[in-house]
Amino acid sequence: MTLKSQDYAALAEDAYEDRAGGRRDPSQEPAIDIGGHMYKVLEHVNDRRTGYQGTVYLREDTNEVIVAHRGTEQILHDALIADAGMVVARTNTQAPEAIALTRRAVEWAEQKSELTGKHMEVSVTGHSLGGALAQVTAHHFDLKGETFNAYGAASLGYRIPEGGNAMVNHVMAADPVSAASGHYGQVRIYANPNEISNLHSSGFRNGAVAQFLVPDSALLAAGRSLQSHKMENFLAEKSVLDKPETQALAKENSGMISEYRDKLEFLRGGVTTITRGGMGNAADIIDRIRGPLDAGEPARKVTEEEQRRSSSLRMDDAQHPGYMMFLGAQRGVQEQDARVGRSPDIGSTQLAGSLAAEMKAAGGERIDSVLMNK
């Protein structure tokens, strides 16, 4: 991947832009400047029912495909339904749409790679809720990417492991959202003086003895640190990404930062346990016993299930992936029956099915006509 962290940040921010939904033909789509690089939008989804919004970009100079999932913007759909659902139910109502959009991006890149003979990289990004969706989809399809102040996906009910190097998750030290849950991938922490001051005034100290002697309040600190969650911390002249001193400050104050973030995650875990109830907690215990899934395994399982389902269907079943090809073969066989004065029967249907199966096995996409050998 040639994209830098600042490039991902620009795309995560651009995902908040309102666009007409649907797929685009890149040959007909104008290029747009995002963070100093030219991109074309391949697809945009904006579902007002669930609040999900995502955009697929094609970077012109490198032919890389990036899926950017939009973060928390609408209070009702995002904060109350999607964000709260991650805490209470360990699920995300927007995840199925995010996975579907990412799947289309991966399939598009694979098709283009076959045509050109050059591999096209696909990666993901997002801020806040969008960062959680980026982690979910990265694990689902075994992709790389970067997030910004994401709600960590490791606590969700998708059997996603915590840690690893598949993702880079950039977080502000006092951001309460990214502190509430473990992350898929590595975490890079940045701090500014105002955050350290807020943590200090909320009772947090560096060093075990100081932490023991001075009472602290994670919720008070979180309430004072809402500015830390904003995407602007990673953009333009305010960006902490290219300021080594922000990571150095975080390292110098790692004691109080870790204490604060650990307490917020503990509090979130308590809320999850209480609201999940007996059945929910039992399911969570089973998931912990089963352990996390390998990266890419969810997508492989879906593919295997689709193949199993399609192999059990007859070619003349409308759900079969070769059904349209069967209809073309059937139409051609019936035309030949009519030419010789024969009424179509079960044999005609079987012949059409055989022709369609052979054409599909040979890599064909459709049957336009059927001709008899002389």
Regions found by a protein language model. Give the residues of each.
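Gly/Ala-rich beta-loop-alpha elbow adjacent to hydrolase catalytic centers
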Residues: 125-130, 134
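N-terminal low-complexity, Ser/Thr- and acidic-residue-enriched intrinsically disordered segments
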Residues: 1-24
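Residues in well-ordered beta-strands of folded domains
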Residues: 12, 68, 171
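Divalent metal-coordination and catalytic microenvironments
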Residues: 67, 127, 145
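Mature extracellular "passenger" or substrate-interacting domains of secreted, surface-exposed proteins
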Residues: 8-9, 122-123, 173
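Serine hydrolase/lipase
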Residues: 58-64, 139-331, 336, 340-352, ...
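A conserved cap/lid and substrate-binding interface adjacent to the catalytic center
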Residues: 20-122, 140-141, 151, 155, ...
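Short, Φ-rich (hydrophobic/aromatic) sequence segments
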Residues: 8-12, 332, 355
